[in-house]
Amino acid sequence: GKPKPETLKVSVGYQAGWIGEGEISYAGAHAVERAKLAGEIIHKRIGDHFDEFRVDYIGLSSLHGESLSQGSSSYEVRLRIAAKSKNQALAQLVGEEVEALYTNGPAGGSGARKYLSEVIGVVSILMNRDQIHPHIQVFKS
């Protein structure tokens, strides 16, 4: 056989930031237009503060983007805004801003929800074999 490799591949988890989300529904006449206006409002207010910022219109463009839904009209649509940041408080702001659309956004918004999720990243690295010491511990519940 071959000699053991000097390095071993190790997957390392690390704290990779936060994702803040907010959702709100619009229904009835001009639901799509109101949802798009709400998305524009949030994007203008906070969009530039994030590493990643996404606006989806669930029921209209959340799966295939807007290329396949252009010109279509929907009686109801759910606005979803998600953004990623290294700062937890900033990520939490996304949901707060969407929730504020109840009183400070287009008429008829309902069912607002907000979420905050920690992002755990994974990266593979090579470590010297002599730095790795296997250890097994069994916990009983």
Role assignments for model-derived ranges:
Residues 1-141:
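C-terminal non-catalytic interaction/assembly regions of soluble proteins
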